[in-house]
A protein has these predicted regions:
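Vicinal oxygen chelate
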Residues: 2, 5-14, 46-47, 66-152
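Core segments of cupin and vicinal oxygen chelate
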Residues: 3, 12-58
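Hydrophobic pocket/interface hotspot
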Residues: 19, 23, 79, 96
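Short beta->alpha connector loops
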Residues: 36-37, 60-61, 108-110
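Flexible, glycine-rich phosphate/dinucleotide-binding loops
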Residues: 38, 62, 133-136
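A short, acidic/glycine-rich surface segment
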Residues: 40, 61-67, 103
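Acetyl-CoA-dependent GNAT
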Residues: 57-60, 130
Length: 152
């Protein structure tokens, strides 16, 4: 493969400070303001060793408010972030639960565990991590509960 991963994803926000506070508090992400002038803000939010969110805030632009159902959002539907480890996944999940940013349901896709969440602007995103309980060759459909997170 000639690629090493995704470098960045550009997203729109209505409130850069709220956005960077959320990603900083939940994911320990750092941010750097790059440009701010004439109703235009660009901030880089580092979400991995080589990956970032390029966060744009434009005065008068309301596109960030459009949160339609999954598969109705245009060409890019959502982004998925990779947790560094299962321990990190659990810590992030707890932080998201504390902010009511997720229902906490973890999907077992086989090789990957997945948790959906919503950011401060309503942008739906996903947190993933390698599944330590995977059975080689088994891939599960969406909605398959991860046994390690089932209570009761």
């Amino acid at each position: 493969m000639l690629l090493g991963g995704i470098n960045h994803v550009a997203v729109l926000t209505g409130d850069t400070e709220r956005f960077t506070e959320f990603y900083g508090a939940v994911f320990d992400a750092s941010s750097t303001a790059v440009q701010e002038q004439d109703g235009f803000k660009l901030t880089m939010v580092q979400v991995g060793p080589t990956a970032e969110l390029n966060v744009f805030e434009l005065a008068g632009n309301t596109e960030w408010q459009r949160q339609v159902p999954m598969f109705g959002r245009g060409r890019l539907d959502h982004l998925a972030l990779e947790a560094e480890s299962l321990v990190a996944f659990d810590e992030i999940r707890n932080r998201l639960l504390a902010r009511d940013a997720t229902d906490g349901f973890v999907t077992d896709f086989g090789p990957v565990l997945s948790l959906f969440f919503r950011g401060p602007d309503g942008l739906e995103a996903e947190l993933c991590v390698a599944n330590p309980d995977t059975t080689p060759g088994v891939v599960n459909p969406p909605g398959t509960p991860a046994i390690r997170y089932v209570t009761g």
